[in-house]
Amino acid sequence: MDVSWDADNFEPKLPTTLAASNKWEGEDEDDNVKESWEDEEEEKKDEEKTEAAPPPQPKPKKKIHDKIAERERQEREKAERLVTEKTAEEMTPEQKLAEKLRQQKLQEESDLRLAMETFGVTEGNIGKLDNFHPTTKEEYTEFADLLTKKITFYKAKDEFPGFIDDLVKNILVQMSSADIRRIKLTVDNLYIEKQKAEKNDKTKKATKGKGKAKLKLEGDNAHLNQYESYGNFDDDYDDFI
Protein backbone atom coordinates (compact mmCIF):
# COMPACT_ATOMS: atom_id res chain seq x y z
CA MET A 1 0.00 0.00 0.00
CA ASP A 2 1.52 3.27 -0.99
CA VAL A 3 2.41 5.73 1.71
CA SER A 4 1.43 9.26 1.08
CA TRP A 5 4.06 11.91 1.51
CA ASP A 6 1.43 14.21 2.78
CA ALA A 7 0.35 11.93 5.61
CA ASP A 8 0.75 13.30 9.04
CA ASN A 9 2.35 10.20 10.52
CA PHE A 10 4.97 9.81 7.85
CA GLU A 11 8.55 9.29 9.23
CA PRO A 12 11.43 8.90 6.80
CA LYS A 13 13.74 5.90 7.46
CA LEU A 14 17.48 6.57 7.71
CA PRO A 15 19.85 4.24 5.87
CA THR A 16 21.23 1.52 8.13
CA THR A 17 24.66 1.40 6.44
CA LEU A 18 25.75 4.86 7.74
CA ALA A 19 28.91 4.54 9.86
CA ALA A 20 28.85 6.15 13.30
CA SER A 21 32.52 7.11 13.18
CA ASN A 22 33.56 10.74 12.81
CA LYS A 23 37.03 9.80 11.43
CA TRP A 24 38.07 10.25 7.87
CA GLU A 25 38.63 7.33 5.61
CA GLY A 26 41.93 5.59 6.31
CA GLU A 27 42.44 7.30 9.73
CA ASP A 28 41.69 4.10 11.67
CA GLU A 29 44.24 2.23 9.58
CA ASP A 30 46.97 4.73 10.57
CA ASP A 31 46.20 4.25 14.27
CA ASN A 32 46.36 0.50 13.92
CA VAL A 33 49.73 0.68 12.14
CA LYS A 34 51.16 2.99 14.82
CA GLU A 35 50.04 0.72 17.64
CA SER A 36 51.58 -2.24 15.81
CA TRP A 37 54.97 -0.47 15.58
CA GLU A 38 54.93 0.42 19.29
CA ASP A 39 54.15 -3.18 20.20
CA GLU A 40 57.06 -4.41 18.09
CA GLU A 41 59.47 -1.92 19.72
CA GLU A 42 58.38 -2.97 23.22
CA GLU A 43 58.83 -6.63 22.30
CA LYS A 44 62.35 -5.90 21.01
CA LYS A 45 63.27 -4.08 24.25
CA ASP A 46 61.97 -7.00 26.31
CA GLU A 47 64.04 -9.41 24.21
CA GLU A 48 67.20 -7.28 24.65
CA LYS A 49 66.73 -7.18 28.44
CA THR A 50 66.26 -10.92 28.49
CA GLU A 51 69.44 -11.46 26.48
CA ALA A 52 71.50 -8.98 28.59
CA ALA A 53 70.64 -10.54 31.96
CA PRO A 54 73.12 -13.40 32.66
CA PRO A 55 71.59 -16.61 33.84
CA PRO A 56 71.97 -17.24 37.60
CA GLN A 57 75.01 -19.34 38.46
CA PRO A 58 74.14 -22.64 40.07
CA LYS A 59 75.53 -23.13 43.58
CA PRO A 60 78.55 -25.42 43.68
CA LYS A 61 77.59 -28.79 44.91
CA LYS A 62 79.87 -31.03 46.88
CA LYS A 63 80.81 -34.22 45.20
CA ILE A 64 79.48 -37.44 46.61
CA HIS A 65 82.87 -38.67 47.83
CA ASP A 66 83.56 -35.30 49.54
CA LYS A 67 80.28 -35.55 51.42
CA ILE A 68 81.06 -39.11 52.44
CA ALA A 69 84.57 -38.17 53.60
CA GLU A 70 83.24 -35.23 55.64
CA ARG A 71 80.59 -37.39 57.26
CA GLU A 72 83.14 -40.10 58.09
CA ARG A 73 85.48 -37.53 59.62
CA GLN A 74 82.73 -36.14 61.85
CA GLU A 75 81.66 -39.61 62.94
CA ARG A 76 85.28 -40.57 63.66
CA GLU A 77 85.87 -37.46 65.79
CA LYS A 78 82.65 -38.11 67.66
CA ALA A 79 83.63 -41.73 68.30
CA GLU A 80 87.10 -40.71 69.53
CA ARG A 81 85.60 -38.14 71.86
CA LEU A 82 83.19 -40.69 73.30
CA VAL A 83 86.00 -43.21 73.79
CA THR A 84 88.13 -40.62 75.57
CA GLU A 85 85.29 -39.63 77.90
CA LYS A 86 84.41 -43.26 78.59
CA THR A 87 88.05 -44.16 79.21
CA ALA A 88 88.41 -41.30 81.68
CA GLU A 89 85.35 -42.51 83.57
CA GLU A 90 86.64 -46.09 83.70
CA MET A 91 90.15 -45.12 84.86
CA THR A 92 91.31 -46.14 88.29
CA PRO A 93 92.73 -43.43 90.58
CA GLU A 94 96.24 -44.66 89.74
CA GLN A 95 95.57 -44.44 86.01
CA LYS A 96 94.10 -40.97 86.37
CA LEU A 97 97.21 -39.88 88.29
CA ALA A 98 99.48 -41.37 85.62
CA GLU A 99 97.53 -39.57 82.90
CA LYS A 100 97.76 -36.32 84.85
CA LEU A 101 101.53 -36.73 85.18
CA ARG A 102 101.83 -37.50 81.48
CA GLN A 103 99.93 -34.33 80.58
CA GLN A 104 102.07 -32.37 83.04
CA LYS A 105 105.25 -33.74 81.44
CA LEU A 106 104.06 -32.75 77.99
CA GLN A 107 103.32 -29.25 79.28
CA GLU A 108 106.78 -29.02 80.88
CA GLU A 109 108.44 -30.10 77.65
CA SER A 110 106.48 -27.45 75.79
CA ASP A 111 107.48 -24.81 78.35
CA LEU A 112 111.10 -25.96 78.12
CA ARG A 113 111.18 -25.55 74.37
CA LEU A 114 109.68 -22.09 74.72
CA ALA A 115 112.23 -21.10 77.37
CA MET A 116 115.10 -22.43 75.27
CA GLU A 117 113.97 -20.24 72.40
CA THR A 118 113.68 -17.27 74.75
CA PHE A 119 117.24 -17.69 76.09
CA GLY A 120 118.70 -18.46 72.69
CA VAL A 121 119.41 -22.11 73.48
CA THR A 122 118.29 -23.73 70.28
CA GLU A 123 118.72 -27.23 68.96
CA GLY A 124 121.27 -25.82 66.55
CA ASN A 125 123.37 -24.53 69.45
CA ILE A 126 123.09 -27.87 71.23
CA GLY A 127 124.27 -29.68 68.12
CA LYS A 128 127.11 -27.19 67.79
CA LEU A 129 128.07 -27.76 71.41
CA ASP A 130 128.23 -31.52 70.92
CA ASN A 131 130.46 -31.17 67.87
CA PHE A 132 132.55 -28.30 69.21
CA HIS A 133 136.30 -29.03 69.51
CA PRO A 134 138.08 -25.82 70.55
CA THR A 135 141.78 -25.37 69.88
CA THR A 136 142.39 -21.62 70.21
CA LYS A 137 141.73 -19.20 73.07
CA GLU A 138 138.86 -17.59 71.16
CA GLU A 139 137.28 -20.98 70.52
CA TYR A 140 137.57 -21.91 74.19
CA THR A 141 135.88 -18.62 75.10
CA GLU A 142 133.02 -19.44 72.75
CA PHE A 143 132.91 -22.99 74.12
CA ALA A 144 132.67 -21.64 77.69
CA ASP A 145 129.86 -19.32 76.64
CA LEU A 146 127.87 -22.20 75.11
CA LEU A 147 128.42 -24.38 78.18
CA THR A 148 127.42 -21.59 80.55
CA LYS A 149 124.18 -20.95 78.69
CA LYS A 150 123.41 -24.64 78.61
CA ILE A 151 124.14 -25.27 82.30
CA THR A 152 122.66 -22.12 83.87
CA PHE A 153 119.45 -22.70 81.96
CA TYR A 154 118.52 -25.11 84.79
CA LYS A 155 119.58 -22.82 87.66
CA ALA A 156 116.02 -22.57 89.04
CA LYS A 157 115.90 -26.29 89.81
CA ASP A 158 116.38 -27.39 93.41
CA GLU A 159 119.03 -29.90 92.36
CA PHE A 160 121.14 -27.29 90.59
CA PRO A 161 123.55 -26.40 93.48
CA GLY A 162 124.34 -30.07 94.12
CA PHE A 163 124.84 -30.61 90.41
CA ILE A 164 127.36 -27.74 90.27
CA ASP A 165 129.17 -29.16 93.31
CA ASP A 166 129.56 -32.55 91.65
CA LEU A 167 130.47 -31.02 88.30
CA VAL A 168 133.24 -28.82 89.71
CA LYS A 169 134.72 -31.61 91.83
CA ASN A 170 134.69 -34.04 88.90
CA ILE A 171 136.54 -31.50 86.78
CA LEU A 172 139.04 -30.34 89.41
CA VAL A 173 140.05 -33.84 90.41
CA GLN A 174 141.61 -34.25 86.99
CA MET A 175 143.66 -31.06 87.27
CA SER A 176 146.99 -30.32 88.93
CA SER A 177 147.23 -28.80 92.39
CA ALA A 178 148.66 -25.59 90.93
CA ASP A 179 145.65 -25.18 88.68
CA ILE A 180 143.30 -25.99 91.55
CA ARG A 181 145.03 -23.38 93.74
CA ARG A 182 144.65 -20.75 91.02
CA ILE A 183 140.99 -21.64 90.58
CA LYS A 184 140.53 -21.55 94.37
CA LEU A 185 141.82 -17.97 94.45
CA THR A 186 139.36 -17.07 91.72
CA VAL A 187 136.50 -18.67 93.64
CA ASP A 188 137.56 -16.97 96.90
CA ASN A 189 137.63 -13.61 95.16
CA LEU A 190 134.21 -14.32 93.67
CA TYR A 191 132.90 -15.36 97.09
CA ILE A 192 134.05 -12.11 98.73
CA GLU A 193 132.61 -9.93 95.99
CA LYS A 194 129.36 -11.89 96.08
CA GLN A 195 129.01 -11.33 99.83
CA LYS A 196 129.51 -7.59 99.39
CA ALA A 197 126.94 -7.44 96.62
CA GLU A 198 124.35 -9.35 98.66
CA LYS A 199 124.97 -7.15 101.71
CA ASN A 200 124.49 -4.00 99.65
CA ASP A 201 121.40 -5.50 98.11
CA LYS A 202 119.84 -6.07 101.52
CA THR A 203 120.47 -2.48 102.62
CA LYS A 204 118.94 -1.08 99.41
CA LYS A 205 116.09 -3.55 99.17
CA ALA A 206 113.50 -1.10 100.49
CA THR A 207 114.56 1.62 98.05
CA LYS A 208 112.40 1.72 94.94
CA GLY A 209 113.74 2.34 91.49
CA LYS A 210 117.18 0.90 92.19
CA GLY A 211 118.30 -2.40 90.77
CA LYS A 212 120.04 -5.21 92.52
CA ALA A 213 123.69 -4.60 93.30
CA LYS A 214 126.05 -6.45 91.02
CA LEU A 215 129.59 -7.50 91.67
CA LYS A 216 132.30 -6.44 89.26
CA LEU A 217 135.56 -8.31 89.12
CA GLU A 218 138.78 -6.73 87.97
CA GLY A 219 142.19 -7.91 86.90
CA ASP A 220 142.61 -11.56 85.93
CA ASN A 221 139.03 -12.35 87.00
CA ALA A 222 137.38 -9.65 84.89
CA HIS A 223 136.29 -12.23 82.31
CA LEU A 224 133.84 -13.65 84.88
CA ASN A 225 131.70 -10.53 84.68
CA GLN A 226 130.13 -11.69 81.42
CA TYR A 227 128.64 -14.73 83.16
CA GLU A 228 126.83 -12.73 85.85
CA SER A 229 123.71 -12.55 83.67
CA TYR A 230 123.49 -16.33 83.50
CA GLY A 231 122.75 -16.84 87.19
CA ASN A 232 124.10 -16.77 90.73
CA PHE A 233 126.51 -19.39 91.96
CA ASP A 234 126.03 -21.03 95.33
CA ASP A 235 128.00 -19.88 98.34
CA ASP A 236 129.32 -23.34 99.14
CA TYR A 237 132.17 -23.42 96.63
CA ASP A 238 134.72 -23.21 99.42
CA ASP A 239 133.47 -26.47 100.94
CA PHE A 240 134.95 -28.71 98.29
CA ILE A 241 138.29 -26.86 97.90
Curated annotation (Swiss-Prot):
Residues 61-118 form a coiled coil. Residues 26-45 have a biased composition (Acidic residues). Gene3D superfamilies: Eukaryotic translation initiation factor 3 like domains. Residues 1-94 are annotated as: Disordered. It comes from the Eukaryota. GO terms for biological process: formation of cytoplasmic translation initiation complex. Keywords: Coiled coil, Cytoplasm, Initiation factor, Protein biosynthesis. GO terms for molecular function: translation initiation factor activity. GO terms for cellular component: eukaryotic 43S preinitiation complex; eukaryotic 48S preinitiation complex; eukaryotic translation initiation factor 3 complex. The keyword Protein biosynthesis applies. Component of the eukaryotic translation initiation factor 3 (eIF-3) complex. HAMAP family: eIF3j. Component of the eukaryotic translation initiation factor 3 (eIF-3) complex, which is involved in protein synthesis of a specialized repertoire of mRNAs and, together with other initiation factors, stimulates binding of mRNA and methionyl-tRNAi to the 40S ribosome. The eIF-3 complex specifically targets and initiates translation of a subset of mRNAs involved in cell proliferation. This is Eukaryotic translation initiation factor 3 subunit J. It comes from Bombyx mori.
